[in-house]
């Protein structure tokens, strides 16, 4: 065994350890001998303890996500002629949208029966639980409200904002990794990770797969924008973001472990799963609508027939 550094080691994990955790079906395909040096992740999610107060890696990552998103948003709106005051005002709308939308999304997308039976538990933020699809819904509503307030189209604001989301969302997945949550399914790949605070099963580092989606989507958006296909405000950038990001989310979700997800137990979702013959994550179900919305926005933008070179005439 190599010495641990910040709780990270690489060591052989006997398959019998995995079997003892009740994952026999998941690890049956592994050999009965030792696993080939998986990474063992055993980092304390708390960075600093100050009496009853704690500073967690997730909280730091959440702050970095907000800072990154605002920096990209501010740079873009200034580049396209909006004022600094305009950019800063959105901060007062966007931050509550992220927190409220993310929390409500987690409560009612993943455990609706629990929170409908006891609605006050929604406010128990210290118990954790923020859903990215809820964040997306909250931001979409906020962009609409902000566009009405400032007499600017929703598609223009969304084209400003989409790259900011793409580049900042990865920080949340880093926080998930430090928390040893949103873990992957059992795996025998060379980069498998044992999340020792969860169990001793080598798994896909699904958080890191999700992490890669954001920068990749950001690069796609830059490429689309630089090709001068349609002007900012056509909705092409926002549509491309929704289609690429959530399309990749549907793909990556298959590597995540399954949990008790009440939405999947409700009709018609359970009936569709039974008809298809394979399980579908709640995250996959929730990603379908954004992908369809993105495809609609792309089609609408492409039918507009206006090129980016005409932006000067359509910007305001």
Predicted regions and their residues:
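Hydrophobic, membrane-interfacing alpha helices
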Residues: 29-316
């Amino acid at each position: 065994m190599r010495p641990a550094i910040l709780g990270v080691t690489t060591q052989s994990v006997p398959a019998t350890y995995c079997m003892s955790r009740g994952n026999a079906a998941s690890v049956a395909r592994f050999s009965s001998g030792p696993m080939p040096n998986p990474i063992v992740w055993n980092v304390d999610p708390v960075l600093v303890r100050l009496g009853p107060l704690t500073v967690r890696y997730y909280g730091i990552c959440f702050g970095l996500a907000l800072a990154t998103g605002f920096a990209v948003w501010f740079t873009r709106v200034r580049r396209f002629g909006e004022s600094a005051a305009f950019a800063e005002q959105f901060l007062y709308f966007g931050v509550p949208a992220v927190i409220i939308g993310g929390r409500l999304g987690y409560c009612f997308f993943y455990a609706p029966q629990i929170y409908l039976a006891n609605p006050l538990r929604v406010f128990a933020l210290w118990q954790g639980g923020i859903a990215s699809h809820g964040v997306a819904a909250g931001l979409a509503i906020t962009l609409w409200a902000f566009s009405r307030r400032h007499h600017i189209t929703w598609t223009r604001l969304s084209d400003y904002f989409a790259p900011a989301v793409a580049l900042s969302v990865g920080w949340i997945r880093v926080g998930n990794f430090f928390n040893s949550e949103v873990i992957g399914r059992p795996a025998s790949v060379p980069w498998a990770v044992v999340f020792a605070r969860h169990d001793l099963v080598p798994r896909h580092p699904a958080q890191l797969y999700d992490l890669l989606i954001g920068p990749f989507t950001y690069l796609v958006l830059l490429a689309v924008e630089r090709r001068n296909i349609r002007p900012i405000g056509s909705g092409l950038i926002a549509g491309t973001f929704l289609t690429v990001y959530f399309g990749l989310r549907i793909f990556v979700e298959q590597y995540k472990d399954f949990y008790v997800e009440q939405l999947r137990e409700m009709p018609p979702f359970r009936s569709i799963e039974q008809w298809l013959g394979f399980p579908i994550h709640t995250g996959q179900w929730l990603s379908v609508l954004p992908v369809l919305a993105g495809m609609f926005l792309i089609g609408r933008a492409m039918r507009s027939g206006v090129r980016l070179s005409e932006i000067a005439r359509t910007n305001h």
